[in-house]
Amino acid sequence: MIAGPAALFADGQAESDNCVLPSHHAGVSFPLDQVEKAWACRLQPIISHYTTATKIGSERTPLPQDIFLYLLDHPVMAAALVNRLDFGLYKAEQRGPQDFWATDGEGTEGTIHPLYQEGSTRMYFAQGSHDGRLLPRVTGKAVVLLQLHPVTDGRGIESIDSTLVAYLRLDNRLLSGLLSLLRPLIESVVHRQLLKAFDAARLLGGAMREHPEKVLFEATDPPALPDEEVAFLKAALMSLHNPTLSPGPTP
């Protein structure tokens, strides 16, 4: 968990007049200059006046980059597999051509808009709510920055190391007076929720490598996943057990 002044996360202060966003966050570079100006002006107050700022990683997922990216860019499919394999209570639904809604099934839900999806970098805007046992219901907006790095271990197993930086700004004015007291608790909740998502991804990757038949069964058990996703999954599972094969390009 990262704490302290905003300077620790951003090299230079974003200029509110033209909504220029810094490119360095917690020691990692992100191409925020590629974000459309209208979006940049929505992100600027979240990054400059965050409630919490969190860095996680690197976290390893035992999947090659092409398979990992496909699942990352198909969150409805990924959430369904995690749920059916009992790795979590995640659910996701497409909301329009780009946005999707997601819940962890334990009080956190929201809509997510992809801002940038190129190469090994993903950047998102999220807005949602958390209703848990330790906190009153809170709503807020977040900027989520994700950097991926493919690695191969000594056994030749391809994996992805992920580093995530997230800025959260709460909407609830009633909490502003208590923020100094609640901040450690809020930071703990955010950190736990993000780690839980990485754990689910790691478990899914492990199942795809070690129990491909079970993964495919869950994907095709009625109601089956869409045909194109099942086709990719079949090819991906085959490639994991025969590295000379490739699951094909990521649509």
Q: Over which residues does each language-model region extend?
A:
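A mature extracytoplasmic/lumenal domain signature
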Residues: 72, 83-86, 96, 104-106, ...
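Bacterial N-terminal signal peptides
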Residues: 1-6
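Short solvent-exposed beta->alpha transition segments
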Residues: 78-101, 221-237
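Coil-to-beta-strand transition motifs
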Residues: 51-52, 121, 155-159
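Terminal "cap-and-tail" regions of soluble proteins that handle hydrophobic small molecules
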Residues: 12-35, 147-251
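Hydrophobic ligand-binding cavity/cleft-lining segments
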Residues: 10-96
